Each structure stands twice: as C-alpha cells, then as structure tokens.
C-alpha cells in the first residue's frame, strides 16, 4: 500500500478510507424564500437526514472502510491559536458580511467558542442576525442603518454534506476547487486548512488546482477511471478553461495520468455534474443516463511538446471507453432501464450517482428500484441505503463521499 496520505487511482478499487460530512445545523437554516440562493430545491428534515447519513456511514464501516469526517479533520487542522485566529479572519473575509459592527460582533462570537470542532460546525451552520447583540444607534454605519430584512449575517453552507465537490482526490494529489456559486465556494476553505495544516494531510499533498483560481471546477466532474485515464465533465458547474488549467498541472507535475476524456453535456441543474449522469461501477461497466447520450461530445486530451493536444472523438462511447481502459467490451447500463419516465425520475433522485466501493460492489439509494434491478441483473452487488431526506439536496452516494484511499486495481 502507498505511503502517500492520498491514494486514489480509480473509481472502483477497494475503498479503504473515505471522508464524509454529517449534516448539521446548516440544514435548519434553510428557508423557503432563499432556497435558490443556497442551491436547494427543498428543505430536508435534519433529524431524519442525520439518521440516514449515519446509516450510510455504518454501511461503509460494515465493508471495512474507515470513515473520516470533514468537520473533525478541519478542527484538527487548527493546530495553534495563530492558525485558529487566521481561520476565523479568513472565514469572515469570505462571508460577505454587511456592516462593520456586524463583523466585529461575529468575530467575538466565534472567538468565544473554545472547542475547535464546535467552532468549525458554527462556521458551517451560518449566523443569524438574531444571534448577535443589538448594535447601539451611535455605532451603526450606513450599511447597518439601511440593511434589509434578510435574516442571516452569514449564510449557512447546506451543501456541505456533498463532500465530493469542494476538492477532489486524483492519484496522490488534490484538486482544491474554485466552485460555481459563491455559496459553495466558501466550502473550499476547510480543504485549504486540512491540506495546509492537518497533522497527517497538511503539507504532504500536491495541489493540482487551487481555490484562488478565477474559473470554476467541482469534484462531481472529476472521475478517476484508471491509473492512466481521467474523465472530466464540462457542465453547469465546471467550465472548459478550468479543465485546461487542471490538466496542464496534472501533466506537468507528473501525477501519473496519460490521458483525459472530457465530456461535454447538457448545461442545467438536473445534470449539474458528470457523476449525476455517468459513474463507473465495475472494470467494464458504467451507469449512464440515456438522455445525455444524443448530445454528448467527448474529447481526448493528452500532453505533447509542452502543450495540450485535443481530439474530438466521433465513435461509439462504449468502444471508446473499452479502448482506453484496456478491456474487451464496456457495458453502459441505462438509468431507469431506458424507460423515459423511469429514467427521468430516478436520475433526479440520483439513480446514476453510485459509489463503487470495490469492483462490482456499489452503494445506491434504495428508492431507485428500476435502475437497481437492472444493476443486479448485470451481476453487481448493491448496498442499498435510504435517502428520502438526503436526496432533497440533489445528490447521491458518490456526491456524499470523497475517497482518500483506494487499493489499486
């Protein structure tokens, strides 16, 4: 086994270590009037969401997988009072706080929290204006005087339980992402501190993308197909310019990959990431949402003479994948068994967003019965979890997990 703290050279190698985030009070700060602002369509019931998430984590442990938690790793990264204060200041600077005195009050609130994990969880939950002391009239600035009725001094981060997106593990390296929306881009701060200051992961992991970049990329669009081949999605959340930056860094830093397949597909919320429509479940099998296949474009990207070489592939997708993975044949298993109604319904409920924990062993939501039956017909072993509340955030088992270590295949 590798001595590197991050070791992910496939989507299907036996999963040894994975990072999750247990949903917290950030979900209780969702409001109907501001769902779109926070990239939600509905409000999960926190108590049941936590039960479902705990069952997900236990299902992974039952398979011998070590489960890490984002909130604990971030807390462990605040290794000195100076780093703790720096974290608070950086968090405040990125929180879009309106009002000078409001920022002072929030700083005092956060500095008064002595336990590091409690501090981290508070930054995730957001800050309601009602939690802060009333600002004296004489101390109010213009912003304080004209501020709207918006109830939050700092927005919550309700998408955090989708740990796949703020950063992505690629080989022994990490892509610390710049995300599509401001409300999610703040999530990458935790990854920054983990990979800079954590006793195990800090300073020991190569970054192949950095959150300070000005173009957007998210982990749901970054798939590690093999030790030689990556797949990336050009999607609603990830643009082509970011992919080019990422790939140049991967090739220049000799992270270990020889080719990238870039998938361009529909730019909309229901297909927000590549992994919502396409995931690898075995050496020679993938799930796919049939609706994307007609308009899908695939580009092969290599690195020659210090520059990217890009070729659009015109052939059959299954044949292209088989050729690049070195297998005789690839089977594309359609979400919803190809039925238009079932496919649309089950893709919306993340029927294509599977987490493979070993070749042919896949974690899925139990609700996607048509797709699950098809996967079982192809010989896959399914670990079914309930997700009636978790799915309201529009993400499945792959979205909710970030592998830190897999066995090689």
From Swiss-Prot:
Alphabetized UniProt keyword annotations: Arginine metabolism, Cytoplasm, Hydrolase
UniProt cross-references to Pfam families, sorted A to Z: ADI (PF02274)
Induction record: Expression of arcA is significantly higher in cells that have entered stationary phase than in exponential-phase cells. Up-regulated by low pH and by arginine. Repressed by the CcpA protein. Part of the arc operon, that consists of the arcABCDT genes.
Record: active site: 399
Catalytic reaction(s) noted: L-arginine + H2O = L-citrulline + NH4(+)
InterPro entries to which the protein is assigned, alphabetical: Arg_deiminase
Pathway(s) annotated for this protein in UniProt: Amino-acid degradation; L-arginine degradation via ADI pathway; carbamoyl phosphate from L-arginine: step 1/2
Family: Belongs to the arginine deiminase family.
Name this polypeptide is given: Arginine deiminase
UniProt source species: Streptococcus gordonii (strain Challis / ATCC 35105 / BCRC 15272 / CH1 / DL1 / V288)
């Amino acid at each position: 086994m590798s001595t590197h703290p991050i070791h992910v050279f496939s989507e299907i190698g036996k999963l040894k270590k994975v990072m999750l985030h247990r949903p917290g009070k950030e979900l209780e700060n969702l409001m109907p009037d501001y769902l779109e602002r926070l990239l939600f369509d509905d409000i999960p019931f926190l108590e049941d969401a936590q039960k479902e998430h705990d069952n997900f984590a236990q299902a992974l442990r039952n398979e011998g997988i070590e489960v890490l938690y984002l909130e604990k790793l971030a807390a462990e990264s605040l290794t000195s009072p100076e780093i703790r204060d720096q974290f608070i200041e950086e968090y405040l600077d990125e929180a879009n706080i309106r009002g000078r005195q409001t920022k002072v009050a929030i700083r005092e609130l956060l500095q008064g929290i002595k336990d590091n994990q409690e501090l981290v969880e508070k930054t995730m939950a957001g800050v309601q204006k009602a939690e802060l002391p009333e600002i004296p009239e004489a101390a109010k600035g213009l912003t304080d005087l004209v501020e709207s009725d918006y109830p939050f001094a700092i927005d919550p981060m309700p998408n955090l339980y989708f740990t796949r997106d703020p950063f992505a593990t690629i080989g022994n390296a990490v892509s610390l992402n710049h995300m599509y929306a401001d409300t999610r881009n703040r999530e990458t701060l935790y990854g920054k501190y983990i990979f800079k200051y954590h006793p195990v992961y800090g300073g020991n992991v190569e970054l192949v993308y950095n959150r300070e970049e000005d173009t957007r990329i998210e982990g749901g669009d970054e798939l590690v197909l093999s030790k030689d081949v990556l797949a990336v999605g050009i999607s609603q959340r990830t643009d082509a310019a970011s992919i080019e930056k990422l790939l140049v860094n991967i090739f220049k830093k000799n992270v270990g990959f020889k080719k990238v397949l870039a998938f361009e597909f529909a730019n909309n919320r229901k297909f927000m990431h590549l992994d919502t429509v396409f995931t690898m479940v075995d050496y020679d099998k993938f799930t796919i949402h049939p609706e994307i296949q007609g308009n899908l474009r695939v580009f092969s990207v290599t690195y020659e003479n210090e520059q990217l070489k890009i070729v659009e592939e015109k052939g059959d997708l299954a044949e292209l994948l088989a050729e690049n993975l070195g297998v005789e044949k690839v089977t594309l298993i359609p979400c919803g068994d190809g039925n238009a109604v079932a496919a649309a319904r089950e893709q919306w409920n993340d029927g294509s967003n599977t987490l493979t924990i070993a070749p042919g062993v896949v974690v899925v939501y139990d609700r996607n019965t048509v797709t699950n039956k098809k996967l079982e017909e192809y010989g896959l072993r399914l670990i079914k979890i309930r997700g009636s509340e978790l799915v309201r955030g529009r993400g499945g088992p792959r979205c909710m997990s970030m592998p830190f270590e897999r066995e090689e295949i």
